[in-house]
Amino acid sequence: MPLNLVHASDGLPRVLLTEPSGSSAEVLLYGGQVVSWKNDRREELLFMSSKAILKPPKAIRGGIPVCFPQFGNLGSLEQHGFARNRVWSLDNNPSPLPSADNQSSVDLILKSTEEDLKTWPRSFELRLRVSLSAGKLTLIPRVRNTDSKAFSFTFALTNYLSVSDISEVRVEGLETLDYFDNLMQRERFTEQADAITFDGETDRVYLSTPTKIAIIDHEKKRTFVLRKDGMPDAVVWNPWDKKAKALSDMSDEEYKTMLCVDSAAVETPIVLKPFEEWKGRQELSTVSSSYYSGQLDPRKVLRGFH
């Protein structure tokens, strides 16, 4: 399938992905960042801040930023690393991944530059395949060590999900797990046995998480299902009102209509020897949520009954 590369008015080239059922996605070369994913009813499923700065070298608030080679401030580099602030290239040799002929996809690559080597002196190739199929968006990141010595890194795909009202959202699949609370100097806690709900700022890294997490939007009767491999942690973030007002690239009230649930490898950095490659995978899909006695039953989603 030929690539639909568009040069938009904001000056940021992007690849448009479409598939027969009518869903679509947009992927910027800047940051290798997915900035739109719409379902077959043309409803936007990803959150994008109305104040997002679409101008390098700023990071873009929304969509699915790629955090590499550092997540957050866990290191000496800029917040969340530099991959989200670099212009990627189309990857004409994406082997050894199998062909994605049966779906709409794009392969991108980011290689270390002389400028990056000054701040992170490690030679690498970061590849990302974004694939769109009916009701599903799949991202496959790969990192290859092209250096002469081993290196380690942390990584995350930050999923800004569009929700109707954060106070009506709950997350299933992270119950009873340990997490680091970034609002408490990364102190370690154990989550309660109930689903996660939101009534204030949340910034947590959940550890050793399952491969499937459900994000249930009561008001829209829609459930996001996040499946992931190679990224054992999950980051859950919402800035709430005070933090949102302090963010220059986010409107004061927009925290109500977004939630970040990230696929991440944070607690234990990934170590690659020369010429070794790491591969992750994340799959986002949506299902209609059914009510029972006024409550959604995400257990069916988590057990794969949908």
Summary of predicted features, one role per range:
Residues 1-23, 30, 40, 111-117, ...:
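Beta-strand-rich recognition/accessory modules
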Residues 4, 9, 77-134:
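Extended, loop-rich substrate-binding clefts of extracytoplasmic carbohydrate-active enzymes
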Residues 20-80:
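Acidic-aromatic substrate-binding/catalytic surfaces of carbohydrate-active enzymes
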Residues 27, 141-147, 286:
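Asparagine-centered strand-capping/turn motif at beta-strand->loop junctions
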Residues 31, 41-43, 53, 116-123, ...:
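Hydrophobic small-molecule pocket/channel-lining residues, especially in calycin-type beta-barrels
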Residues 36-38, 149-155, 293-295:
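Short, hydrophobic/aromatic beta-strand segments
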Residues 133-136, 147:
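Beta-rich strand-turn-strand
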Residues 150-152, 156, 160-235:
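Active-site/ligand-binding surface loops and adjacent short beta/alpha elements
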